[in-house]
């Protein structure tokens, strides 16, 4: 009841240690290796199912995985959406970057991949998969 809900313990549901999703979430919110999860699960689907089954559960998943079995949480009054992720106003998000060996020029094939990955065609594929494309 201290956080506005029923008088019941909050059940924190997360991914297993070593999960990229868990590492990303914990680093974004600044709690690396400090969370104590009631349930540590091995898939996004399992996290969503556990949260959907318990009104006192709280978990984290990728925006692209959210369906109508769970409710997204607003952060600082901002709802999660493609637009709020792209403009940076939804604070719980993680960017991905391309990397290559330091001091080396990209090969023609690697440059072709980067060109495609940053193209409108790739953005359409990314959006079609339910993820947030480049802004």
Report the location of each language-model feature.
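Exported/periplasmic ABC-transporter solute-binding proteins
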Residues: 1-135
């Amino acid at each position: 009841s201290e956080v506005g809900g029923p008088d019941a313990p909050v059940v924190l549901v997360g991914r297993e240690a070593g999960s990229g999703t868990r590492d990303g979430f914990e680093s974004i919110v600044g709690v690396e290796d400090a969370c104590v999860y009631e349930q540590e699960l091995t898939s996004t689907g399992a996290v969503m199912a556990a949260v959907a089954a318990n009104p006192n559960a709280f978990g984290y998943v990728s925006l692209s995985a959210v369906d109508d079995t769970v409710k997204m949480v607003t952060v600082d009054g901002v709802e999660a959406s493609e637009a709020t992720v792209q403009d940076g106003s939804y604070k719980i998000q993680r960017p991905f970057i391309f990397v290559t060996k330091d001091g080396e020029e990209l090969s023609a094939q690697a440059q072709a991949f980067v060109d495609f990955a940053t193209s409108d065609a790739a953005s359409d594929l990314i959006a079609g998969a339910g993820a947030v494309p480049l802004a």
